[in-house]
Amino acid sequence: MYIALKYKESNIVEYVLYMWHIEELIRSFNFEINEVRENVISKFNLNSEAETEMVRWYKGLIDKMTEEGIRDAGHLTELAEVMTEIQYLHHSLMTVYQEKSYQDIVAKAMPSIDALKSKSDGRQRIDIEVAMNGLFGVLLLKLKKRQVTEETQEAVKTISVMMATLAKHYNSMKQGTLSFPKVMEN
């Protein structure tokens, strides 16, 4: 809960990845709050007030996931909305703002994103969704202590740089400080 709040304020990409992980964690404990309390919350060594607050937070997520029908798969509506904002910002930086440095970073990441697209389930996916799914997949592999190939690690580096840059622009957008570059390319 505290980590989620910190990420939400400082790095929206890390926030989404963290919350996707929390969703998977809740699923792995079959939506049982007592299992979450015993296996997750108890590891934080919190005072009783903070523990109660964290239990309430997890219980709220369990209830939302159930209400939204995403017990087996999918993401919370709030996270889907954030993903839409991130995708919209990405598109704006590429076409409206024509942010040259961002365009260069995206160009370096595109071969990795295209490679991930070719390995996906055949559904048409937007670049940001593919990038986030790739980062999340590597995160899960690392959490499960599975080996991540050097090739995958290199691919993820370029995607990580792109998404970190996008997260910085997102913060600027939310703070109202994102502005058009002085020279537009169109």
Predicted regions and their residues:
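Intrinsically disordered or highly flexible coil/loop and linker segments, enriched in small
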Residues: F31-E32, E67-R71, S92-E99, K119-G122, ...
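Extended amphipathic alpha-helical scaffold segments
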Residues: I33-R37, Y58-M65, V106-K117, L135-L139
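Glycine-rich, aromatic-bearing surface loops/beta-hairpins
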Residues: D114-N186
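Charged low-complexity stretches with an acidic bias
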Residues: E67-T95, K174-N186
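N-terminal interaction modules that seed assembly of large macromolecular complexes
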Residues: I3-A73
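A charged, amphipathic interaction segment
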Residues: L76-F136
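Residue-level recognition of alpha-helical structural elements
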Residues: K8-N11, A50, M54, H75, ...
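Charged, amphipathic alpha-helical oligomerization/scaffolding segments
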Residues: H21, S28, E53-R56, G60, ...
